[in-house]
Amino acid sequence: LDNKIIAFLFPFFLLPMKDLLAKFENKRPEIVFEWKDAETEAEGWVVINSLRGGAAGGGTRMRKGLDKREVESLAKTMEVKFTVSGPAIGGAKSGINFDPQDPRKRGVLERWYRAVIPLLKNYYGTGGDLNVDEIHDVIPITEDYGLWHPQEGIVNGHYRATEPQKIQKLGQLRQGVVKVLEDAAFTPDLRRKYTVADLITGYGVAEAVRHYYELWGGRSVAGKRAIVQGWGNVGAAAAYYLASQGARITGIIDRAGGLIKEDGFSLEEIRQLFLQREGNALTAPNLLSFDEVNQRIWSSGSEIFIPAAASRLVTRQQVEQLIAGNLEVISCGANVPFQDPEIFFGPTGEFADQHTSVIPDFVANCGMARVFAYLMETNAEITDQAIFGDTSRVIRRALERTRQQSDSRTGVAQKSFEMALRQLV
């Protein structure tokens, strides 16, 4: 490199992580699309943080009380996630402020997608997210409006695919995302017809833990104790895959209650707890009250913690109790699990990162984003083993890059963020 260029770039390389983050967080998004439903009180936003690589991607969520700021922060989270999962595109998110339990939900979604279809045709790819289901909501509604697949905007905007390429990529997406799992190694029950979309995120969260132990000290997950927060698709699947590797799930805390078993549940017990869920809720005859579990679980001692419930729930006090109980690694199933107002890295997250190994959300839970990227590759092999193996390799590569920076077991999240942001800022 020319000396002048080095002199120009030098301050940039020295920018501390905090400054990089502030710069990225405070940059105005390129596109904000605002919508007000004509028939109900629903309102919504598409935030496209950037059209990096000609397109942007991010799911559609619905919840009462959601605002534009939440959508904007999630769009920025997606942009960071794409640095790990690929493709090299911008981050986006759609959010609708409406009660998902309201019987008018379907009509709201239909009118929403009618309004945003031009974006989805050209440069924005979406999918399911909180309270919006990929397979039952997004795909059928957008199909009715002439979209071949909710990721079509990325195929057009980023890949600039020719007609035959477009047919291949969209065909792979249509087949792969809803693919029913046929390999007993990847599903708790073949008869239940779970799909790739149901299980891939939780699988990635568990694989992140396995790769962490191998890369930092050549250790195994077997025999390690794990606590799981949240028993939806991500938490329950992560627990199932960890138990399959020999980890001992010693505590589960869910919205309505939980379970604690100090010597750990057997793989078969975890499998049954997975299969017996009601919707996304933990059910068991011996369920403890939320208050009792919340009182006991944080100090019960475990090496692994999987936050996989809603965002911003985990408090500083809970982290301190976990650390005192011999915690070694946190694999973030939830986006932004720590109770900080900051978009990415607040004081609680920073405290955790300084005292234990934190695998950040954009690495640990990038499974679904990675499946989309994989299925847009030319001639993707659509088998359970190929799809799950690809997600596992991508997560491992991201952790390997962080490990090459330092063998320290703290600061893992900070180093991972820094490497991602240098690609974006």
Annotated model-derived regions:
Residues A7-L15:
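Hydrophobic alpha-helical signal peptides and transmembrane signal-/tail-anchor segments
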Residues A185-S299:
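Glycine-rich phosphate/diphosphate-binding loop of Rossmann-like nucleotide-binding domains
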Residues I48-V80:
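N-terminal cap/recognition module
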Residues P16-E34:
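Short, Gly/Pro- and small/polar-rich lid/capping loops
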Residues G257-V358:
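Rossmann-like adenosine-cofactor binding region
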Residues I323-V425:
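Adenosine-phosphate binding glycine-rich loop
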Residues E39-R52, T83-A88:
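N-terminal glycine-rich anion-binding loops that anchor highly charged ligand groups
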Residues T83-V221:
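Glycine/serine-rich phosphate-binding loop and adjoining beta1-alpha1 elements at the start
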